[in-house]
Amino acid sequence: MSSSPDSPPILHRLPRVAIIGAGRVGSTLAQRIAEKNLADVVLLDIVEGMPQGLALDLLEARGIELHNRQIIGTNNYADTSGSQIVVITAGFPRKPGMSRDDLLRTNAKIVVEAAKQAIAYSPCAIFIVVTNPLDVMTYLAWEATGLPRNRIMGMAGVLDSARFETFIALELGVLPADVKAMVLGSHGDLMVPLSRHATVNGIPITELLDAATIERLVERTRNGGAEIVELMQTGGAFFAPASATSLMVESILLNQSRLLPVSVYLQGEYGLKDVVIGVPCRLGLNGIESVIELNLSDSEREALQTSAQSVQKNIERWHSTQHS
């Protein structure tokens, strides 16, 4: 329906993504989103000058990268107002010898505060949590915002699946894009790589690799983040996590309905309730359009339940510190 001459003009603002935390993951994600021409970006951090400097650096690359996306650096949550997607990457990274769970106490307060501030300015946004320990942080952000579960999720399974696919491709000497695999469960030592569903151009890897080799690749996937931390010594991975997050952002903003493993609040699926854990979901304009229940084997289902129990224990651990 066309508007009358006296009615106000209808403004179609470009989509905006707010990234809370301008560290290596956050700043690389800002670059990915802008250069894929997905949305304007607001990069927020508590360190004065840092997000502003990063935003200016990214702006100066626009002519070279052939896009015209706006990139704002700020220390003020008001500048994130009206974002379609909020990504929380703020928090301390792992150091050598640390597990993701070791970050619980330090990062929980950061994520809860970031979620509360961001939702106040973007009440209709979809939230993606990246901060570790991922599944617990996503649960706490869900509690802090009161959002329906379709609008809050964690990025873990996309990254873990990409690592599994990479290691399979390296072992077989094939193109990574030809490998399809899925990793469920928590983002940690108890993740559940689904080996029997992994394929190379439709051929199950069980027909290409022996059981011992597959188990070795599964273990390397479980330790994929720690391997990078040990090598770098000064932080963790950021290129692949940023790419994994940008894929989720793309599927939502472009309504691609991609089937991706993401951490989501479960309400009985897989026999699990009141826990956030990685399972296959379809991502579109509404965030999580649907949760997909796979027909897992007994051992896979048991591994997923063990993974969920670990997440629940950490949630309870955090809650106990708040009431003590």
Swiss-Prot record:
Q: Which residues act catalytically here?
A: H187 (proton acceptor)
- In which residues is substrate bound? R94, R100, N132, R163
The record's InterPro entries line, in alphabetical order, gives: L-lactate/malate_DH, Lactate/malate_DH_C, Lactate/malate_DH_N, Lactate_DH/Glyco_Ohase_4_C, Malate_DH_type3, NAD(P)-bd_dom_sf
Whether NAD counts among this entry's keywords is: yes
Extract the CDD domains matched here: LDH-like_MDH
Name the UniProt key words of this record, in alphabetical order.
Answer: NAD, Oxidoreductase, Tricarboxylic acid cycle
Residues binding NAD(+) are G21, A22, G23, R24, V25, G26, D45, N107, V130, T131, N132
Root EC class: oxidoreductase
Q: Which GO terms describe its molecular function?
A: L-lactate dehydrogenase activity; L-malate dehydrogenase (NAD+) activity
Q: State its Enzyme Commission number(s).
A: 1.1.1.37
BP-aspect Gene Ontology terms:
lactate metabolic process; tricarboxylic acid cycle
Catalytic activity as recorded in UniProt: (S)-malate + NAD(+) = oxaloacetate + NADH + H(+)
Q: Which SUPFAM superfamilies match?
A: LDH C-terminal domain-like (SSF56327), NAD(P)-binding Rossmann-fold domains (SSF51735)
Per the entry, what this protein does is:
Catalyzes the reversible oxidation of malate to oxaloacetate.
- Into which family does the record put it? Belongs to the LDH/MDH superfamily. MDH type 3 family.
Q: Which HAMAP family match?
A: Malate_dehydrog_3
Q: Identify this protein by name.
A: Malate dehydrogenase
Q: Which gene encodes it?
A: mdh
